[in-house]
């Protein structure tokens, strides 16, 4: 397919500057500095420093702390797309080589190679005595001292329990995939993706596998340790002599092979965050063999298209059932005819169409036997195979993005788009990097004890998104990611995220009463990552209603996307009213004030949270868009919100029906039931 490796919009070429021994590498919104040390001395993201002190490689050799001497740091190559820098370090007994590949989107692929040092020439000629080194490497860690106030939030994958002092602090749960970092020190098992930051910026770490790692135990692959004004992110690579170096031969200089450790580092946001958090007004619709029902009259309109247009809908998101064969990009005749008609009718009304493509290969696919084994994700545990069932009756199996399926899917989508130009993609789980041991496409690896371990296809998902982005970005299309993890490595090549589905089961069953707000602050605002967000919500009254979803969402800059028929038309119209009120506000010129920061506008009842945007016009008058929500399970009565100094006529444009709130001398008075918005 036509895929470019060139710098794509909105990114800028990689810039490299070497001054006084410092090498600065800048990409859009971020700067990494190597200052003659063993790792980064500075990482600036979104205008602010993340590191409290330089990153470091910590180790112990023969019982003594390793002291590294940096011998050379070299700019190996530099193009618009990437820069490669290598560093050579040595200690008393070991040599360390580090290779950095800086990509224009901000991902830095780091490779550490440690090996035993050799004898110098004088020792070889017996002019100096041979050293009696044991070459014992008892410890090797990477430590990242971050500014503590920049590390209030986390995100993890694979999801697991979170431990403190060896005991479970948080049980593994969907709502614990991301959240507030607790006080004290914590430790976690292996993480393929790990992000630490706050609501405007952060630092991500990526490891596709755990090759050569020997932490003290499986619960201590990653640690967060408080140290005054620092929070240290620690990767325990080794806590004992490498098993592969367990060699009876005496001359370790020749018989101990280099150990390699790969770790990717990526400061966020991965692209400039959009000024407006609401980049389109979409509805997800369930279409299959009844697609022509969209041509039927509804609510006094000649057809569904005109009705949706009247509600302000700009984008039709097609549920998976639009394609009779799940995810197969070569459409059958019936699906192709329906899709061509739908795109034509939507475009007549200047509405966009985003069809669904997911993460599976279908048993209904005509090439299933040929493709299944080589494309599929093969988990370590056979019984953990990810499958789906849908009508017409078919089984759908998760594919691995490290396989050739990625090329097959991208090429099929490109051909379909050339034939019936559409406006973007609804990617369901496509960038979710399931652990895979399928050797047919290169996944899986064997540890020193003979056990097969999983590869997490993070880079494969990233490459697929790069290909799809190159198709749709030039024409103004929208690519979403919809995943149960924050795969920040692939996010540069998306425009928005659709979040919330992974936690719907909990919300549907239990309601939002115990919802950990840290999850929302991490995954919903999008400002820390650089992409707009939209909520997927499936109401289940009375425990989980559209009111609850909207109230929980708006104070985190996210709004539920209507989904018909899972939401009735009344819910769709309700959300449309809110969107029409929101769309009047000039987000591009406004400042953002989330409730979790110290702001001027605070409700009299601490149960009620206020998030708002302020725009000051050329006449000096301030306009405000204020979202208030009671994030508790109790009703908040007689709530007062101070709004003196703002244009009340703007504030009084309240999207709620039958608003019984009132303004009195710059104070807004109202009552708010639990988990609803004003």
Regions found by a protein language model. Give the residues of each.
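Active-site-proximal substrate-binding groove within the catalytic cores of carbohydrate-active enzymes
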Residues: 457, 462-653, 665
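The substrate-binding groove and active-site-proximal loops of carbohydrate-active enzymes
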Residues: 281-298, 319-336, 390-410, 421-422, ...
């Amino acid at each position: 397919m036509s895929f470019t490796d060139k710098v794509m919009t909105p990114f800028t070429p990689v810039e490299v500057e070497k001054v006084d021994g410092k090498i600065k590498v800048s990409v859009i919104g971020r700067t990494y500095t190597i200052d003659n040390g063993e790792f980064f001395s500075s990482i600036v993201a979104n205008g602010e420093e993340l590191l409290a002190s330089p990153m470091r490689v910590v180790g112990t050799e023969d019982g003594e702390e390793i002291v590294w001497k940096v011998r050379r740091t070299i700019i190996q190559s530099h193009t618009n797309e990437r820069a490669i820098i290598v560093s050579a370090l040595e200690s008393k007994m070991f040599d360390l080589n580090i290779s950095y590949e800086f990509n224009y989107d901000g991902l830095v692929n780091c490779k550490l190679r440690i090996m035993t040092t050799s004898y110098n020439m004088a020792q070889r000629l017996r002019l100096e005595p041979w050293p009696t080194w044991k070459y014992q490497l008892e410890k090797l860690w990477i430590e990242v001292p971050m500014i503590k106030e920049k590390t209030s939030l986390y995100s993890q994958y694979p999801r697991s329990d979170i431990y403190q002092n060896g005991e479970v602090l948080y049980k593994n749960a969907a709502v614990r995939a991301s959240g507030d970092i607790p006080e004290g020190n914590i430790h976690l098992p292996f993480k393929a993706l790990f992000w630490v930051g706050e609501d405007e910026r952060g630092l991500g770490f990526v490891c596709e596998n755990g090759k050569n790692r020997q932490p003290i135990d499986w619960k201590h692959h990653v640690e967060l340790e408080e140290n005054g004004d620092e929070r240290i992110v620690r990767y325990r690579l080794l806590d004992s002599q490498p098993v592969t170096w367990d060699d009876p031969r005496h001359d370790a200089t020749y018989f101990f092979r280099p150990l390699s450790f790969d770790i990717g580092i990526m400061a966020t946001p991965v692209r400039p965050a959009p000024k407006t958090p609401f980049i389109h007004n979409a509805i997800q619709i369930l279409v299959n063999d009844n697609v022509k029902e969209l041509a039927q009259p509804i609510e006094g309109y000649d057809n569904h298209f005109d009705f949706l247009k009247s509600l302000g809908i700009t984008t039709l998101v097609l549920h998976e059932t639009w394609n009779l064969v799940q995810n197969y990009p070569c459409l059958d005749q019936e699906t192709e005819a329906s899709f061509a008609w739908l795109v034509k009718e939507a475009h007549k009304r200047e509405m966009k169409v985003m069809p669904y493509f997911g993460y599976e290969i279908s048993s209904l696919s005509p090439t299933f036997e040929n493709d299944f084994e080589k494309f599929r994700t093969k988990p370590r545990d056979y019984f953990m195979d990810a499958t789906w069932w849908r009508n017409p009756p078919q089984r759908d199996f998760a594919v691995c993005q490290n396989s050739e399926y990625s090329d097959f899917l991208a090429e099929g989508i490109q051909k379909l788009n050339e034939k019936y130009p559409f406006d973007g993609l609804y990617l369901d789980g496509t960038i979710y990097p399931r652990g895979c041991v399928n050797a047919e496409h290169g996944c899986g690896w064997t540890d020193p004890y003979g056990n097969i371990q999983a590869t997490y296809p993070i880079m494969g998902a990233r490459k697929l998104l790069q290909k799809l982005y190159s198709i749709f970005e030039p024409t103004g299309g929208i690519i979403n990611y919809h995943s149960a993890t924050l795969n920040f490595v692939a996010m540069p090549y998306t425009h928005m995220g659709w979040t919330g589905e992974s936690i719907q089961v909990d919300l549907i069953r239990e309601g939002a009463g115990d919802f950990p707000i840290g999850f929302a602050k991490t995954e919903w605002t999008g400002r820390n990552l650089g992409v707009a967000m939209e909520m997927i919500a499936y109401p289940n009254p009375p425990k989980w209603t559209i009111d609850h979803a909207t109230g929980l969402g708006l104070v985190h800059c996210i709004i539920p996307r209507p989904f018909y028929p899972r939401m009735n038309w009344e819910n769709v119209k309700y959300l449309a009213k809110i969107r029409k009120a929101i769309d009047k506000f000039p987000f591009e010129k406004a400042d953002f004030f989330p409730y979790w920061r110290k702001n001027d506008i605070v409700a009299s009842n601490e149960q009620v949270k206020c998030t708002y945007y302020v725009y000051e016009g050329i006449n000096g008058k301030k306009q405000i868009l204020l979202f208030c929500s009671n994030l508790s399970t109790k009703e908040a009565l007689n709530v007062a919100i101070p709004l003196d100094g703002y244009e009340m006529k703007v504030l009084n444009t309240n999207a709620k029906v039958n608003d019984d709130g009132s303004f009195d001398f710059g104070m807004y008075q109202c009552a708010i039931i639990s988990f609803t918005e004003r």
